[in-house]
């Protein structure tokens, strides 16, 4: 076996949440090129369908599915649809993040925190738990959570110099990414 074959994902099924954005798009391309049947899911189905069409033209199998992380039934439907279509999910990449709730600095209401945490923390727990249970039954699988160094070190706006990306200066982003790092450690110890 050569080196590239050892990294092959042929016969594997992968899900990327938030698969049309800055990082998600590159993750989807890599999984598809490695041979995985790749699902991408988020609220913006139009953007996902565009990514899926582009990857299909390149000869890869990428399927766009609707997902609203603020709704439990949407997470459950996504899981059931993937299992029904593919029979399993070998790789879950939690990449989606919502930044629509919250303000700069201290000007955040508890309602903003609750809405943001529902999507970026509670839904992370639910989707990870659902897919992990299936992976445990299959005795195989990988879960990758896309965090940020901002969840560990705090504000580092210099990281964005020279890019067209706007730094996250709402405390919600740092709070949630720090939580994601620790949730990932906990989940790894339990699985």
Protein language model annotation of sequence segments:
Residues 13, 20-21:
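Conserved glycine-rich cofactor-binding loop
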Residues 45-46, 66-77, 110:
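The beta1-alpha1 cofactor-binding region of Rossmann-like NAD(H)/NADP(H)-dependent oxidoreductases
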Residues 95-101:
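Conserved NAD(P)H cofactor-binding loop of Rossmann-fold oxidoreductase domains
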Residues 103-105, 109-115, 157:
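Substrate-binding pocket helix/loop in short-chain dehydrogenase/reductase
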Residues 133, 189-190:
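Alpha-helical segment proximal to the catalytic Tyr-Lys
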Residues 144-189:
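Catalytic loop of short-chain dehydrogenase/reductase
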């Amino acid at each position: 076996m050569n080196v590239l074959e050892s990294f092959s994902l042929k016969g594997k099924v992968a899900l990327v949440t938030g698969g049309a954005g800055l990082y998600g798009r590159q993750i989807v391309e890599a999984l598809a090129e490695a041979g995985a049947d790749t699902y991408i899911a988020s609220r913006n189905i139009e953007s996902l369908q565009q990514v899926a069409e582009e990857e299909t033209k390149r000869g890869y199998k990428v399927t766009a599915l609707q997902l609203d992380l603020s709704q439990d039934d949407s997470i459950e439907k996504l899981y059931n649809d993937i299992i029904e279509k593919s029979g399993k999910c070998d790789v879950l990449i939690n990449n989606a993040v919502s930044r629509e709730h919250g303000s700069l600095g201290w000007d955040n209401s508890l309602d903003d925190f609750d809405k943001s945490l529902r999507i970026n923390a509670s839904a992370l727990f639910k989707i990870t738990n659902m897919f992990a249970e299936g992976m445990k039954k299959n005795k195989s699988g990988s879960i990758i959570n896309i965090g940020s160094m901002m969840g560990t070190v705090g504000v580092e706006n210099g990281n964005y110099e020279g890019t067209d990306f706007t730094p996250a200066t709402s405390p919600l982003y740092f709070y949630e990414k720090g939580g994601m790092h620790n949730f990932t450690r906990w989940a790894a110890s339990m699985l």
